């Protein structure tokens, strides 16, 4: 009886853990294409100020607020997040490979890792890998980068629309940019989702140099 009960509990535990595991990635659809066809995925030239609303779902907690991104091509961005009701704020600066997110834990939960943050802005910048597989399906180009796969990128035309971080054949984190001015970041293991809705995007002449220091 004890062995049977122990076996049942163990099986149930394994099922629960399997249900919590990040999803496995499927094989890329479409026809093979040369890796040289992979778009560059760069930021638009110049400087832009982007205003957005954000919502963070982290377990049972939901937070909302407003934010501003100050973007300077080719490789600099400052993000400021303001919690609804004026109850807090956070900031991050990403310049090239250097990401600074000082302050409380909430700020770090609002900011994806470096490569995914760049992807949220439309810039394709992942660590170099020896193996890249590119396939095209119905005009959509997808690329698996690394062997085993570490990154999966999706392009519509020359525009980066989705970037996924993969580990052990499972989807760990992803960022998706849609045509309706929405951006979503999802951490599958942490069950955390950040959604942005862009309110405005304006070209500006310059930024005060002090914004790059936190």
Residue ranges and their predicted role:
Residues 87-91, 150:
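Local beta-strand/beta-hairpin segments that build beta-sheet-rich folds
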